Amino acid sequence: MTIAVGRAPSRGWFDVLDDWLKRDRFVFVGWSGILLFPCAFLALGGWLTGTTFVTSWYTHGLASSYLEGANFLTVAVSTPADSMGHSLLLLWGPEAQGDLTRWFQLGGLWPFVALHGAFGLIGFMLRQFEIARLVGIRPYNALAFSAPIAVFVSVFLMYPLGQSSWFFAPSFGVAAIFRFLLFLQGFHNWTLNPFHMMGVAGVLGGALLCAIHGATVENTLFEDGDGANTFRAFNPTQSEETYSMVTANRFWSQIFGIAFSNKRWLHFFMLFVPVTGLWMSAVGIVGLALNLRAYDFVSQELRAAEDPEFETFYTKNILLNEGIRAWMAPQDQPHEQFVFPEEVLPRGNAL
């Protein structure tokens, strides 16, 4: 009889940390959690701090906090002043010099929230990658979540990087986002941009597909239980599918003449439409950062200028855009001291 005596191989600190991070718990941490949880906490905490008591008087000449009388729809963490350029406005940097009050006044919370928010979103996408790998499924959830990340990064970071300063990014607030949308329309004619059109088609098309898919599945559910409603009538461990793909295929074949032939193609299409739309809108925003123009119908503008009786919806929208610029520039950028003489203000052909 032979007895072998040996030592268990020693485990390094990396293996110990890896086991602890991936331990089965109520809220999974994982390696992605090292990025996600601190960044999400700091971004949300910075936004709540700014909207509670930090003013935008020094950066925009506005009241933007609950302390100043704003409400949930009008509070915001505002962008720094135009004069700050693209400075990260670190608390210990040359602008604030470690003074927390001065840091708030200069708009230092905005880059703080924007950068931690971006890394928090990336951490959440990596979390979906990590958990998908651990449970043995494909990582398409993470791929889908890349679309809103692309929109966030393009709007809040890449667009102002293409402009003169962070000042031209959207502030973090509901009414502030609306102001930014008006800005994009007035200065970039964004609604006529083909990338915006693809984004709208993707988002609304995705919503339509989601509604149609949910209704079709509900219509073709098998009645395999005696529960009082849909949510009690099915056993979550049943081996067979809960709805009839064949019946759904026959229904839509009669409605449109065509239908999805299998579930894989159907669900890939539901993934493809909104994700592609959001990615295209993000590409369009990068184009706006570079001040690229799209769909300027100059021939119509020239004819409208020469012929008082000629006007199209396009030329009318161009006049509206000029009105937005003439109104918004002095209001939104008072530091530039813009003065527009009466004769340059836009007027429709009917006036």
Curated annotation (Swiss-Prot):
Enzyme Commission numbers on file:
1.10.3.9
Instruction: Tell me the protein family, please.
Output: Belongs to the reaction center PufL/M/PsbA/D family.
Compartments reported by the entry:
Cellular thylakoid membrane
Q: What is this protein called?
A: Photosystem II D2 protein
Signal peptide span per the entry? none
> Does the keyword Metal-binding belong to this entry?
yes
Which keywords describe this protein according to UniProt?
A: Chlorophyll, Chromophore, Electron transport, Iron, Magnesium, Membrane, Metal-binding, Oxidoreductase, Photosynthesis, Photosystem II, Thylakoid, Transmembrane, Transmembrane helix, Transport
Which biological process, per GO, is one annotated for this protein?
photosynthetic electron transport in photosystem II
Identify the InterPro entries for this entry. D1/D2 (IPR055266), Photo_II_D1/D2_sf (IPR036854), Photo_RC_L/M (IPR000484), Photo_RC_L/M_CS (IPR055265), PSII_PsbD/D2 (IPR005868)
Origin species, per record, is Nostoc punctiforme (strain ATCC 29133 / PCC 73102)
The membrane topology of this protein is: Multi-pass membrane protein
Q: How does it assemble?
A: PSII is composed of 1 copy each of membrane proteins PsbA, PsbB, PsbC, PsbD, PsbE, PsbF, PsbH, PsbI, PsbJ, PsbK, PsbL, PsbM, PsbT, PsbX, PsbY, PsbZ, Psb30/Ycf12, peripheral proteins PsbO, CyanoQ (PsbQ), PsbU, PsbV and a large number of cofactors. It forms dimeric complexes.
Q: Which residues cross the membrane?
A: 39-59, 123-139, 151-164, 206-226, 277-293
